[in-house]
Swiss-Prot record:
Organism: Klebsiella pneumoniae (strain 342)
Pathway, per record: Glycan metabolism; osmoregulated periplasmic glucan (OPG) biosynthesis
EC code: 2.4.1.-
Compartments, record wording: Cell inner membrane
Main location: membrane
Family: Belongs to the glycosyltransferase 2 family. OpgH subfamily.
Disulfide bonds: none
Membrane topology: Multi-pass membrane protein
GO cellular component labels: plasma membrane
Keywords in alphabetical order: Cell inner membrane, Cell membrane, Glycosyltransferase, Membrane, Transferase, Transmembrane, Transmembrane helix
Residue stretches spanning the membrane: 140-160, 194-214, 513-533, 568-588, 600-620, 622-642, 656-676, 680-700
The encoding gene: mdoH
One Gene Ontology molecular-function label: hexosyltransferase activity
Protein's name in the database: Glucans biosynthesis glucosyltransferase H
Length: 842
């Protein structure tokens, strides 16, 4: 079989169609496939003429009549997106310096935004009512939190051993030996630091406690007059004039999982009968060429399988500006004006059609709602770590989400996905300018969701959490290290966002959101400092002689005090604040029926195991988050390159590499405290034991085998596992199907396989006009690539080739026309583990 016959055999044609093709030359084959009989100046451009035929035979059910067009140079182009109608989306520059803004105001240059109300008198009165209620509630929260903190801090002050602050007079220390002065002051300085840190941390814990408590009462009572979900009956027809875009920004994601979830979501939308009101946009920022080709293939298959022509679109950006927020902004500028609403989906998001329809109805019923955030439920993972986290978020999460809604009402959070957004005000007010200045906290905003919610509220639009709306799902990281990688990004983003704390016009609630966002990570180094100062105080107490006389003519000594009854009372109170939300959560499950969680005994046992698991992980997260915060402030780059692995498990080597320093710290800390005072080690045991066990907990909890075993025992069971909704069952089924036909090494297939080459050529984004300099550059790219072995062609160079239809055509032609000349490429392709189902395109 010669090379021409081999090529014809690789075409997606019937035997009769193959036999009708000439076998004299490769150029003749492409000319025979070209119904339009185009002529090309170069022989290796002839595959451009057969792109349409190869696509039509490969994916006949995926193409509509007007999708294949000719670009300005007469090359076949696959229109994967509708015609753009551009809108202006211009960000306002940030003024983060309050002194500069005050000076502008003095000079009459106040640019604080003011927005006209869009509401009727009745709607304004209704809105003012809930805003007033929300303000009163938040003042109550502030009063409760501060009162509790003041009482606890006073208790803490009486517990600390050194009570002689009032007797210390700096004037008496003048001329005194410096070492004596230092030793007199040291215990009190340490105690002051401990007291300040305790107050901050206790206030943080107290706010969480009251949030969970109010969420518990909301869910227990079951009636909420301010719930946005109560504003519709639930069966109103959707307004055909207000269409919704489901947008999914992705970047180098698991293609099989992305398209499985998207297919399940779309089929659920179709089942509601409302599919005509929705379009789907897959917005790719992927820069891995293999994944890019796999995405294109999966998109074509999705369209064929759900008959999604004209409603499911795909776009890969050539310039990845501002990451995810820039991806969404680009959609809004080009196609946003065609839609009233958009629902933002993550790569792992799955939503039911009823949930999506309900979100649209809520937008229709609440004309001043700018963002409505659903409450995603975690499901779909099998590792022990993920199942434990799924159980925790499913049991505890509703309390905190309902509590957030209770305090915030329509001035709430937006989490960046599984939420519906009103497009017009988003375009007008939510464009994000880079943060001014230089350094680690300048540049493009990373945690864009909190900032977009703040800007939407600043413009007068409401931001709501539909905490009681079912049908919204997501997935969690499979293991601790993957979660920490995500936390590294979120830490940087939240620290950057805090620069906006004093920006003009921000609502106090969203200033508080910025504060809580930064405290989510800043609490870790504060907690670590609290433990370090407590340890230092114990060292001082054990190794130095107390200073009984702090004044020259003091009559009575100041004895260090130890009041264990108060210490135990304060410890118990703190434990109540930390663990009562968990108890309230399980009480709620017991009241509403524990059957879906495995029954009364198993759900209770799962709760106890989860508490133990969280105690083991808390110190580990504390140290990692401390490193993240310190590195962000010092401008250090935290490089985290994990080895490739076939599943979600953490190898033992990586576990000890990541947690080895924590294990060593735990051992040194434990031995040192045991040597000083065994009684103090008892109080410190939860910390040091967790650090010593961290590599073992991290590795074992990442095993799916252990997680599946707990699933068989009905531990950490959640309702989505006990009785999976149809959309999740469909996601699993489609994921299995996609895994069977998964495409690996997509770039090599796009070079060699006629079908995938046609697809890559038709969807290539670099549609340049002919030019002499451009031709020289193209020829250089192709020649340099073919003169090297494929493994030496790096990702960026592959992406350049993949983005140009001409270079892909020439690569394809040359490796088939002269296989002996380019044997390194041919041999590399033949050695690939080919998946016959992935190549079965017809």
């Amino acid at each position: 079989m010669n090379k021409i016959t081999k090529y014809i055999d690789a075409l997606p044609l019937s035997d009769a169609e193959k036999s009708a093709l000439p076998d004299t030359s490769l150029q003749a084959v492409h000319q025979a496939l070209d119904d339009e009989h185009q002529t090309f100046a170069r022989e290796d451009d002839s595959p451009l003429g057969s792109v349409k035929a190869r696509l039509a035979h490969s994916w006949p059910d995926s193409l509509s009549g007007d999708q294949l067009v000719k670009d300005d140079e007469g090359r076949t182009q696959l229109h994967a997106m509708p015609k753009a109608r551009r809108s202006s989306m211009i960000p306002d520059p940030w003024r983060t310096n309050p002194v500069g803004r005050f000076w502008d105001r003095l000079r009459g240059r106040d640019v604080t935004p003011r927005y006209l109300s869009r509401l009727t008198q009745e709607e304004r009165e209704s809105e003012q009512k809930w805003r007033t209620v929300g303000t009163i509630r938040r003042y109550i929260l502030l009063l409760l939190t501060l009162s509790q903190t003041v009482v606890a801090t006073w208790y803490m002050k009486t517990i600390l051993p050194y009570q002689g602050w009032a007797l210390i007079n700096p004037a008496d220390m003048v001329g005194q030996n410096l070492w004596i002065s230092f030793m007199q002051l040291l215990p009190y300085v340490l105690q002051s630091g401990i007291l300040i840190l305790f107050a901050v941390l206790f206030c943080w814990v107290s706010a969480g406690f009251w949030t969970a408590l109010m969420g518990f009462l909301q869910l227990l009572i079951g009636r909420d007059k301010y719930s946005i979900s109560a504003s519709t009956v639930g069966d109103e027809p959707l307004n055909p004039a207000h269409r919704t875009a489901l947008i999914m920004p992705i970047c180098n994601e698991d293609v099989d999982r992305v398209f499985a979830g998207l297919r399940a979501t779309w089929e659920s939308v179709k089942a509601t009968g409302n599919a005509a009101h929705f379009d789907v946009y897959i917005l790719s920022d992927s820069y891995n060429p293999d994944i890019c080709v796999a995405e294109q293939k999966a998109w074509m298959e999705l369209i064929a399988e759900v008959q999604g022509e004209g409603q499911i679109f795909y776009r890969r950006r050539r310039r990845r500006v501002k990451r995810k927020s820039g991806n969404i902004d680009d959609f809004c500028r080009r196609w946003g004006s065609q839609y009233s609403y958009m629902v933002v989906l993550d790569a792992d998001s799955v939503m039911t059609g009823e949930c999506l329809s309900s979100l649209v109805r809520l937008m229709e019923a609440n004309p001043n709602a700018g963002i409505i955030q659903s409450s995603p439920r975690a499901s779909g993972m099998d590792t022990l770590y993920a199942r434990c986290q799924q159980f925790a978020t499913r049991v505890y999460g509703p309390l905190f989400t309902a509590g957030l809604h209770f305090w915030q009402l329509g001035e709430s959070h937006y989490w960046g996905h599984n939420a519906i957004i009103r497009v017009k005000p988003f375009i007008e007010h939510c464009a994000l300018a880079p943060l001014p200045g230089e350094g680690n906290f300048a540049g493009s905003i990373l945690s864009h969701d909190f900032v977009e919610a703040a800007l939407m509220r600043r413009a007068g639009w409401g931001v709501w959490i539909a905490y009681d709306l079912p049908g919204s799902y997501e997935e969690l990281p499979p293991n601790l290290l993957d979660e920490l990688k995500r936390d590294r990004r979120w830490c940087q983003g939240n620290l950057m966002n805090f620069r906006l704390f004093l920006v003009r016009g921000m609502h106090p609630v969203h200033r508080a959101v910025f504060l809580t966002g930064v405290m989510s990570y800043l609490s870790a180094p504060l907690w670590f400092m609290f433990l370090a100062l407590s340890t230092a105080l114990q060292v001082v107490h054990a190794l130095t002689e107390p200073q009984y006389f702090l004044q020259p003519r003091q009559l009575f000594p100041v004895w260090p005090q130890w009041r264990p009854e108060l210490a135990i009372a304060l410890f118990a109170s703190t434990m109540v604040l930390l663990f009562l939300p968990k108890l309230l959560s399980i009480i709620l499950v017991w009241c509403k029926g524990p059957k879906e969680y495995g029954g009364f005994i198993r759900v209770t046992l799962s709760l106890l195991l989860e508490v133990l698991f969280s105690v083991l992980l808390a110190p580990v997260r504390m140290l990692f988050h401390t490193v993240f915060v310190v590195s962000a402030f010092l401008g250090w780059e935290v490089v985290w390159n994990s080895p490739q692995r076939d599943d979600d498990s953490t190898p033992w080597g990586e576990a000890f590499m990541r947690h080895g320093s924590q294990l060593l710290l735990g051992l040194v800390w434990a031995v040192g405290m045991a040597w000083l005072d065994l009684r103090f080690l008892f109080w410190l045991a939860p910390i040091v034991v967790s650090l010593i066990l961290s590599p073992f907990v991290s590795a074992i909890s990442s095993r799916a085998t252990v997680g599946l075993r707990t699933k068989r025992w009905k531990l950490f069971l959640i309702p989505e596992e006990y009785s999976p909704p149809q959309v999740l069952k469909d996601t699993d089924a489609y994921l299995t199907l996609n895994r069977q036909r998964s495409l690996d090494d997509g770039f090599m297939h796009a070079v060699f396989n006629p079908s995938f080459n046609a697809l890559a050529t038709a969807m290539a984004t670099a549609r340049h006009r002919h030019g002499h300099i451009l031709e020289i550059a193209r020829e250089r790219h192709v020649e340099q690539a073919l003169n090297e072995t494929p493994d030496k062609l790096n990702r960026d160079r592959r992406l350049v080739l993949l983005s140009d239809p001409v270079t892909m055509s020439r690569l394809h032609y040359r490796v088939w026309a002269a296989p002996e000349k380019y044997s390194s490429w041919v041999n590399a392709y033949q050695q690939l583990a080919l998946n016959p189902l992935a190549l079965k395109t017809k």
